[in-house]
């Protein structure tokens, strides 16, 4: 859900501190504004500590049932407006120097590591991209607007007197400084690779800072502003089938096709290692070039493969020292694709052990039952143990197994919410951000979340559902939901078959089942979801013998041992977990509620505040 926040028109004056009104702004996403007649207050551009501007930086798009104040503090993105002006001025100066000493055509300079601890991509800097000023005119920021408070970062639109707008992205402090630094370095390098090597339409990055030591005083990415509308506006996952059996497919494919084409281009390069992409200077320890066969001298050795920034390796790992965590995040040899699974299992087990040690000394920042942590250790060690047996990597039963195991880019957010149709470029789709993009085998890559579906498959309501015509309307709606989710995923897989058919066997049901324990671990969002990893392992146990006979797996005997007592306990715990989810309507969002809904629920007396400031749902 998108809501609008504040806009700061900034008027710089030499003789005195500048004053700037703060007000809500209608966003480029075209949704409703909070107020048509905003109240104005004023702030001095030179006063970074002016309390009048605090609301501009505070998180306002939702509230949490528990620890609301702490969660919002993590998402406060206060930065220096003066510092931002200095950074943009520096980019203009670099652009002028570049114009004076323009390199030969086709030569792309490496990233520039600047004295102010920012990194600029000088090939993206020009009067066309940054705007131009009159002689002796000083660049200044004229207006700013907070246009999106995302799940992991805040997005600001910045206008200047050079008649150009920028996007400033600031990550929330929900991870360690090291995690944010690695993530930003990798994201910018991956966007650069997508632009220069793959020819994808992405926002051009002008500059970034990997930590808060730069003039902006926050980690940031400063990039091109693209005016347009989200592809999400065209996506209706519950679109009814058209009477002609075709029109609805065209509507759905209007969204699926551009995203599938993005995916196929991302998959087109085979890398020399598994991990994530960086600029060569940001990870100089890489063994050789990121990929083979580069003929453009400007791109040779521009990038390297380093530690994976996939979210699962960094999420909720504060109990581990950085040097310990770094032992598990790669990069990994391309000859050992399943080491990614093994490392993730070992990392999660080590994290659970560290949390258990803290819990036993009453030093845990997030208390949890010790029995749950012990169960997590067992589950994740099981995942690590089975990793080398999950796939028979020499099997000819899975077509093109060699291609499925090669290192390829994996974008975790191929989603219509992450694609903008540029109104100035004939509605061309632009893939906006590349957070947590990694390099791993396609056989381990799950379908994008907007089409992913693991429930019962229904391809034809009347043929697959016995007595469908005689069901009640409520029952029909349930089956229609399953059918439409099945249909959408099938359309995505059909697009993969069209755009990159040698990888299509990765969506075969046995292959999906084999990677399911790993996928459950990757997508785990809370402590109790270790049960979903366990459930996937136990399901594999039931079919392992059949898979072994068909040479899908490399071991004849299932590698893990489960006692009847363990199986019974798992079943009981899993049922209790599902019952708790049913009772907790906001469990899927970890207790986060959109602000409008939160305020309405409080007014209606449905959410009750306790003495600790937390909220519970009135029973």
UniProtKB/Swiss-Prot annotation:
It comes from the Eukaryota. Residues 1-34 form a transit peptide. It is found in: Mitochondrion. Keywords: Mitochondrion, Transit peptide. Its main location: mitochondrion. Transmembrane segments: none annotated. Disulfide bonds: none annotated. InterPro entries: Kinase-like_dom_sf, Mito_inheritance_9. GO terms for cellular component: mitochondrion. Residues 95-115 are annotated as: Disordered. Belongs to the AIM9 family. This is Altered inheritance of mitochondria protein 9, mitochondrial.
């Amino acid at each position: 859900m998108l809501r609008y926040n504040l806009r700061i028109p900034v008027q710089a004056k030499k003789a005195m501190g500048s004053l700037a009104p703060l007000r809500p702004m209608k966003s480029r996403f075209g949704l409703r504004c909070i107020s048509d007649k905003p109240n104005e207050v004023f702030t001095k551009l030179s006063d970074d500590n002016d309390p009048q501007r605090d609301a501009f930086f505070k998180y306002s798009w939702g509230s949490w049932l528990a620890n609301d104040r702490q969660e919002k503090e993590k998402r406060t993105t206060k930065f220096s407006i003066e510092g931002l002006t200095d950074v943009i001025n520096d980019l203009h100066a670099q652009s002028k120097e570049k114009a004076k000493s323009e390199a030969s055509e086709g030569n792309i300079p490496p990233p520039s590591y600047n004295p102010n601890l920012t990194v600029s991509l000088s090939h993206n800097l020009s009067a066309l991209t940054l705007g131009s000023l009159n002689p002796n005119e000083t660049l200044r920021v004229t207006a700013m607007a907070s246009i999106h408070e995302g799940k992991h970062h805040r997005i600001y639109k910045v206008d200047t007197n050079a008649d150009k707008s920028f996007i400033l992205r600031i990550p929330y402090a929900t991870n360690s400084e090291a995690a944010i630094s690695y993530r930003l370095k990798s994201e910018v390098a991956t966007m650069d690779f997508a632009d220069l090597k793959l020819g994808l339409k992405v926002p051009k990055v002008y500059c970034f800072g990997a930590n808060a030591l730069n003039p902006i005083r926050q980690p940031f990415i400063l990039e091109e502003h693209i005016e347009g509308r989200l592809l999400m506006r065209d996506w209706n996952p519950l679109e009814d089938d058209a009477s002609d059996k075709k029109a609805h497919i065209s509507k759905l494919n209007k969204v699926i096709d551009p995203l599938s084409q993005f995916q196929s281009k991302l998959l087109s390069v085979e890398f020399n290692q598994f991990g994530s992409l960086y600029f060569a200077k940001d990870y100089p320890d890489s063994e050789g070039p990121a990929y083979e066969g580069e003929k453009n001298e400007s791109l040779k050795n521009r990038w390297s493969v380093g530690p994976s920034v996939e979210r699962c390796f960094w999420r909720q790992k504060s109990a581990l020292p950085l040097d310990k965590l770094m032992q598990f995040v790669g990069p990994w040899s391309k000859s050992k694709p399943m080491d990614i699974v093994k490392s993730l299992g070992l990392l999660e087990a080590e994290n659970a052990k560290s949390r258990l040690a803290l819990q036993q000394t009453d030093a845990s920042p997030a208390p949890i039952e010790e029995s749950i942590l012990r169960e997590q250790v067992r589950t994740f060690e099981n995942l690590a143990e089975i990793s080398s047996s999950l796939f028979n990597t020499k099997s000819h039963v899975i077509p093109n197994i060699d291609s499925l195991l090669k290192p390829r880019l994996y974008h975790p957010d191929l989603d219509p919410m992450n694609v903008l149709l540029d109104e100035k470029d004939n509605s061309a789709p632009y893939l906006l951000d590349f957070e947590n993009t990694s390099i791993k085998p396609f056989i381990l890559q799950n379908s994008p979340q907007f089409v992913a579906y693991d429930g019962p498959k229904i391809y034809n309501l009347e043929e697959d559902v016995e007595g469908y015509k005689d069901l009640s309307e409520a029952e029909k709606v349930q089956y229609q939901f399953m059918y439409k989710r099945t249909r959408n995923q099938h359309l995505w897989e059909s697009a993969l078959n069209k755009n990159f058919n040698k990888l299509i066997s990765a969506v075969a049901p046995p292959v999906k089942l084999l990677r399911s324990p790993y996928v459950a671990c990757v997508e785990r969002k809370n402590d109790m979801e270790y049960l979903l990893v366990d459930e996937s392992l136990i399901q594999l146990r039931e079919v392992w013998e059949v898979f072994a006979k068909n040479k899908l797996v490399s071991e004849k005997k299932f590698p893990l041992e489960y006692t009847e007592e363990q199986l019974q306990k798992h079943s009981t715990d899993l049922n209790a977990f599902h019952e708790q989810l049913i009772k907790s309507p906001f469990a899927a969002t970890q207790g986060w509620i959109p602000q409008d809904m939160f305020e309405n629920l409080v007014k209606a007396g449905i959410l009750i505040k306790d003495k600790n400031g937390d909220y519970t749902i009135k029973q």
